[in-house]
């Protein structure tokens, strides 16, 4: 799938250098879909990713969750807690931020794909 089919592209222009759409930030590596669980004032969001992990001893799956800190560009400031977003790996932006929010997922996109 192409990126434009998964996310809603930003409608407004921004002057953020760390924006993957309007700035000079290159996205490479892993892409994850997750839920925004916390939004800070300093352009930071915390994303929760839920995955299934196979336990061979019990022959069952268990849910495991990972929380990732990501950078939120100015043009995507309408994203709020509870929204599902797509994030991409990039160069280290700070001590804890190595991912950037690419956009809000469109309705009907499954999180497990």
Curated annotation (Swiss-Prot):
One of its GO terms (cellular component) is cytosolic small ribosomal subunit. GO terms for biological process: translation. CDD domains: Ribosomal_uS17. InterPro entries: NA-bd_OB-fold (IPR012340), Ribosomal_uS17 (IPR000266), Ribosomal_uS17_arc/euk (IPR028333), Ribosomal_uS17_archaeal (IPR019978), Ribosomal_uS17_CS (IPR019979). The keyword RNA-binding applies. Belongs to the universal ribosomal protein uS17 family. Part of the 30S ribosomal subunit. This is Small ribosomal subunit protein uS17.
């Amino acid at each position: 799938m192409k990126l434009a089919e998964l996310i809603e592209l930003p409608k407004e222009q921004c002057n953020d250098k760390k924006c993957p759409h309007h700035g000079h930030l290159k996205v490479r590596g892993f892409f994850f879909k997750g839920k925004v669980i916390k939004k800070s004032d300093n352009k930071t969001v915390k994303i929760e990713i839920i995955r299934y992990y196979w336990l061979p001893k019990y022959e069952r799956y268990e849910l495991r969750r990972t929380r990732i800190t990501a950078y939120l560009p100015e043009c995507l400031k309408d994203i709020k807690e509870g929204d599902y977003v797509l994030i991409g790996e990039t160069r280290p932006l700070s001590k804890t931020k190595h991912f950037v929010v690419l956009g809000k997922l469109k309705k009907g996109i499954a999180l497990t794909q």
